[in-house]
Amino acid sequence: MVTGKELQNKALISLTDGKKVGEIKDLYLDGDATKVAAVFVGKEGVIRQKIWVIERSAIQVCGIDVWLVSGSDKIVNLEDVAGSQTFILGTDLRGREIHTQGGSKIGTLGDLVLDGEARVVGFTLGKTYVQGALAEKKGIVRGALLNLGSKDTPAIVDLPKAEASELPE
């Protein structure tokens, strides 16, 4: 398992010519935050800003030290990626409050936790406002989050499920 922060600044290397095509700046998740949809590599422009990404389908290996890309020509404008309007930037989830279904504050989302195939298995906890099993675990599995919320609304957790499950190591 690896966190989003651990992946920042990892090299993206082309399999075709061994060229470094960029670095992981952040991760775009699919709309349900279950897997990486694209890798954010940078942006340019002030007025007509372009956001550059590599689609997950172009990533061949999600390695420990580098991620391998199928070619050096795989960097595209986010606007040109199908479904990108629903993508969630990983750092946008950091600090988002987590509440129970009844409205009790649990804590805040910390960082993404990914498996070797760039699937989201859970989140670390940033802050915890409760004591007990969840606070000791310092993480929450993705399946325990019923709703990710938004910038203005908290994520909603199934507390019994969160307390009964463990993040893989």
What positions do the PLM features span?
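Peripheral interaction segments used for macromolecular assembly
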Residues: 1-169
